């Protein structure tokens, strides 16, 4: 008899697609993915990027799914908006009669309400969430309260799937033993990006010419939301520390993304490296590869909230160097100081500048590859193992 697995997710997310496809492909599994809303399928406003867009590749292809609502993404965070959507999601999952429910994240309100409804109904629950103790700094009182709340929350779940080393340490600190954990490091759709590598890497020099970037220039690439938690303004501050360094004359900054700090970032870059930066705005999935292909080093100076940083996976698949702050979760798993990686102290422009100077001596990138990178199938395998170990009629 097939095992039935339900997954609960806020909205369609590109990075989850290969996970659900892998689970659905197993002949011993019947899968249903329940989304709170359809954000990203149709053009809609994204509050973080500050632009209106729809994904240019289908994030729900290749597996069964349903939607609890067609409400805007923001409705999932408000109590009044999330409650009716949660009831609908819980009803859809209950009707599916799963053996277990894999819950992605522990927020927003929609996820919390639905999880509580499912727990009340006696469902077996598993958790895959962006958990860490390093992404945010909290006062003693806030930290104490958070720990108490999370300990009780994690008690609802039979098993958890940490996204990385720091995530696993977080669970251990809060009393979840290793036997209730299955580590599967956060992964991107490596097959999708392998196709991007094959498409764009041979065009590297042409792509650079289109942006008037010389072959000998060293391109620093920023990809993502241009928001305070990402601390993008630390980049021009770091470059200012290199004013007397002749290597600054070979640096070009390419910024891919949008957000509330875009204008400020572009203004400060122009002041420090006039004419040697390119603002590309928001780019959809199919176009990201062109910018990784022309770049040399990814920079990710986040100051808080960066539980992993999937752009690190993407950049390394293209063979780029990576410089990130110590607040980035993947720094421990993927970037620890090496020939092609540096980790700087969060918020420290001088330390960031030293990392840039150390890695900008060459415009050569490594051979693209995925051998050392996390793969979505690792999580698929861990989930399947747990499914097969479940006793009969445990849902």
Report each predicted region and the residues it spans.
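A short, histidine- and acid-enriched strand-loop-helix "catalytic/donor-clamping" loop
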Residues: 104, 108-110, 121-143, 156-159
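Donor nucleotide-sugar binding/catalytic pocket of nucleotide-sugar-dependent glycosyltransferases
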Residues: 142-143, 150, 155-205
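Conserved donor-binding/catalytic core segment of Leloir-type glycosyltransferases
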Residues: 214-230, 236-239
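Nucleotide-activated donor-binding/catalytic signature segment of Leloir-type glycosyltransferases, i.e.
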Residues: 263-283
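Short alpha-helical donor nucleotide-sugar binding micro-motif in glycosyltransferases
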Residues: 282-283, 291-295
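Acidic donor-binding loop of glycosyltransferase active sites
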Residues: 293-307, 320
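Short hydrophobic beta-strand element within catalytic cores of glycosyltransferases
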Residues: 312, 321-325
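A charged, aromatic-enriched C-terminal amphipathic alpha-helix characteristic of glycosyltransferases
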Residues: 343, 361-395
């Amino acid at each position: 008899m097939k095992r039935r697995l339900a997954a609960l997710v806020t909205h369609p997310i590109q990075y989850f697609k290969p996970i659900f496809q892998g689970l659905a492909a197993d002949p011993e599994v019947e899968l249903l993915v329940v989304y709170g809303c359809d954000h990203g399928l149709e053009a809609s406003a994204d509050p973080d990027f500050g632009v209106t867009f729809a994904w240019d590749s289908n994030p729900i292809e290749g597996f069964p799914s349903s939607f609890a609502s067609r409400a805007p993404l923001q409705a999932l965070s408000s109590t009044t908006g999330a409650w009716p959507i949660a009831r609908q999601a819980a009803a859809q999952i209950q009707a599916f009669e799963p053996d277990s429910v894999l819950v992605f994240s522990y927020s927003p309100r929609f996820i919390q309400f639905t999880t509580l409804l499912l727990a009340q109904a006696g469902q077996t629950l598993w958790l895959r969430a962006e958990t860490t103790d390093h992404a945010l700094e909290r006062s003693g009182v806030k930290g104490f309260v958070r720990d108490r709340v999370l300990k009780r929350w994690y008690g609802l779940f039979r098993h958890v799937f940490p996204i990385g080393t720091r995530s696993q340490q977080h669970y251990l600190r809060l009393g979840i033993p290793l036997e209730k954990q299955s580590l599967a490091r956060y992964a991107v759709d490596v097959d999708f990006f392998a196709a991007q590598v094959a498409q764009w890497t041979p065009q590297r020099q042409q792509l650079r010419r289109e942006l008037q970037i010389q072959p000998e220039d060293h391109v620093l690439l920023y990809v993502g939301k241009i928001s305070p938690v990402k601390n993008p303004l630390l980049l021009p501050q770091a470059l200012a520390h290199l004013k007397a360094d002749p290597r600054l004359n070979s640096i070009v900054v390419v910024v891919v993304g949008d957000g509330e700090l875009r204008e400020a970032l572009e203004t400060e870059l122009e002041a420090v490296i006039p004419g040697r930066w390119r603002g590309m705005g928001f780019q959809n999935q199919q176009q990201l590869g062109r910018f990784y292909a022309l770049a040399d080093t990814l920079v990710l100076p986040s100051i808080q909230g960066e539980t992993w940083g999937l752009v690190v996976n993407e950049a390394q698949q293209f063979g780029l160097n990576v410089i990130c702050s110590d607040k980035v979760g993947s720094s421990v798993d993927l970037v620890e100081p090496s020939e092609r990686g540096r980790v700087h102290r969060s918020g420290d422009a001088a330390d960031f500048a030293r990392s840039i100077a150390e890695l900008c001596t060459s415009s050569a990138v490594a051979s693209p590859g995925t051998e050392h990178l996390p793969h979505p199938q690792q999580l698929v395998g861990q989930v399947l193992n747990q499914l097969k170990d479940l006793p009969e009629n445990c849902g």
